[in-house]
Amino acid sequence: SAAKIWRPSRGLRQAALLLLGRPGARGLARFHPSRQQQQQFPSLDDKPQFPGASAEFVDKLEFIQPNVISGIPIYRVMDRQGQIINPSEDPHLPQEEVLKLYRSMTLLNTMDRILYESQRQGRISFYMTNYGEEGTHVGSAAALERTDLVFGQYREAGVLMYRDYPLELFMAQCYGNVSDPGKGRQMPVHYGCKERHFVTISSPLATQIPQAVGAAYAAKRANANQIVICYFGEGAASEGDAHAGFNFAATLECPIIFFCRNNGYAISTPTSEQYRGDGIAARGPGYGIMSIRVDGNDVFAVYNATKEARRRAVAENQPFLIEAMTYRIGHHSTSDDSSAYRSVDEVNYWDKQDHPISRLRQYLLNQGWWDEEQEKAWRKQSRKKVMEAFEQAERKLKPNPSLLFSDVYQEMPAQLRRQQESLARHLQTYGEHYPLDHFDK
């Protein structure tokens, strides 16, 4: 066919031979193609030769309407009662692995409740819960290798929880005490851990997307047998950085998984006001990215999709987009009151009828791997573990104020050194006006 003959590297050269004739001939009059040659090189009008798209000509004016394209289906493995729908899609995870999924999700939920209340009591300055989205974090984390690099947004604490990040460090970061690896210089919930390959979170939306693509490109060039996973919400997908990241990943063929948590709201803006197309997964094919939409409240669906995307991203050096449909049960943050823009009944429906933790618990009960006594014991144990870490973090001092100026340059510039010295003189003179006894010396 013409598509096979007119390859990008040969098309122009062959077209020139058709127009100019054989070497040594003068003009078109000396060139007489045979019947075989006429069949081999059909008219250029048969198929478009434009370099920017692969398509066919039509002779009828018609715009493509988005509402006539059927929506991308939502892949799921188990129903709301924890029953496997199609046995061939069952990941057949061993009991201990499923219990680890469940314990990670419920421990995260317990930590959320305690830290949310601590902010309301004025003990920490800010917090963001993960209620209702635990399945997206933990299910995807379980499908990754521990060395895969993670770029999060600000609602992926479950990835760190699954990777056994200590509760003490979660608490230290939220309190900004001397045990915080970030030395108290980040907002709460902006975690980072080099040892667990989790890049420190940045508040501005979507900045992590092109950064993650760059990291994936570097991994590809190094033949590292590693992928990068980049998490973001559907609201962040409206940022320009998302477009840049998607396009770079596709054209540079980077081994990356774009993991979009579509939880229904970008702070107070519902999805109906964010976009008119079919969600986020529908954007992938336009960039040349393999895409899938999954039930984010089904931890096994999330696991399967991430596992396969990871396998193919490494084997084929190409990006994948996963849109996990879920619901943000909690407020956007402790600075938000979601009752101003959504009903209590709406929230209660998702909390009571389709919660990822409830669904996985039902699966465990169906398998005979869990019972009510174990549930009560684990709830008590997990709360005790969180409270112990909480109380320990609360007793610790804040980092020394002089650390405000460190860790920016390898060698501190003179200007920063002068500022550091100025702060030290100020505190020495007016120290009685500051709670310096709460800070490390």
UniProtKB/Swiss-Prot annotation:
CC annotations in GO: branched-chain alpha-ketoacid dehydrogenase complex; mitochondrial matrix
SUPFAM superfamilies per UniProt: Thiamin diphosphate-binding fold (THDP-binding)
Enzyme class: oxidoreductase
Cross-referenced InterPro entries: Alpha-ketoacid_DH_E1_comp, DH_E1, THDP-binding
UniProt PTM: Phosphorylated at Ser-333 by BCKDK and dephosphorylated by protein phosphatase PPM1K.
Sequence positions bearing N6-succinyllysine: K352, K376
Keywords: Acetylation, Magnesium, Metal-binding, Mitochondrion, Oxidoreductase, Phosphoprotein, Potassium, Thiamine pyrophosphate, Transit peptide
One protein family per Pfam: E1_dh
Positions with a binding annotation for thiamine diphosphate: Y154, R155, S203, G235, A236, R261, H332
GO process annotations (BP): branched-chain amino acid catabolic process; response to cAMP; response to glucocorticoid; response to nutrient
Modified residues (Phosphoserine): S333, S335, S343
Chief site of localization: mitochondrion
PTM sites of type Phosphothreonine: T334
Ligand binding (K(+)): S202, P204, T207, Q208
Membrane-spanning parts: none
Oligomeric and partner information: Heterotetramer of 2 alpha/BCKDHA and 2 beta chains/BCKDHB that forms the branched-chain alpha-keto acid decarboxylase (E1) component of the BCKD complex. The branched-chain alpha-ketoacid dehydrogenase is a large complex composed of three major building blocks E1, E2 and E3. It is organized around E2, a 24-meric cubic core composed of DBT, to which are associated 6 to 12 copies of E1, and approximately 6 copies of the dehydrogenase E3, a DLD dimer. Interacts with PPM1K.
Role summary: Together with BCKDHB forms the heterotetrameric E1 subunit of the mitochondrial branched-chain alpha-ketoacid dehydrogenase (BCKD) complex. The BCKD complex catalyzes the multi-step oxidative decarboxylation of alpha-ketoacids derived from the branched-chain amino-acids valine, leucine and isoleucine producing CO2 and acyl-CoA which is subsequently utilized to produce energy. The E1 subunit catalyzes the first step with the decarboxylation of the alpha-ketoacid forming an enzyme-product intermediate.
Record protein name field: 2-oxoisovalerate dehydrogenase subunit alpha, mitochondrial
Annotated source species: Rattus norvegicus (Rat)
Origin organism lineage: Eukaryota, Metazoa, Chordata, Craniata, Vertebrata
Gene (name only): Bckdha
